[in-house]
Amino acid sequence: MSSFAPKTDDATTTPSNLTWKEGDEFFPNIGPISYEGPASLNSLSYKHYNAKEMIMGKTMEEWLRFGVCFWHTFRGKGSDPFGAPTMTRPWDDETDTLENAFRRARAAFEFMTKLGIKYYTFHDRDVAPEGKNIDESNANLDAVVDLLEK
């Protein structure tokens, strides 16, 4: 693996050390990202996107309907045809369990909420693990969809 790849032997990022519980934050110490204008020195602020600013009769939020792609943002590991994965996701223990799927979904929605993003896309297997048969796969998807609909 590349020397630029994150180390997974660190106790804070080792997947086997995951201890998140319902209600825990995945992105602690990061509040909602808001518009602060182009002069802001806050790197966690919008400089040009002001959701409520009116442009030609609509708000920026109406014109720019941002969405997050679940697979690329929360499942992708940063690999490409030229190398091994370069990212670890601290909320992802890399198992195909419902518990891990729920954790990924909670991390995604916390992220999107803090950015003010209202839309997302996913494929069925992105959000729910495949089961031993079609009935189990469908049950897994139904369980995760119940969480996604909240």
Which stretches of residues belong to each language-model region?
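N-terminal pre-domain/capping segments
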Residues: 2-150
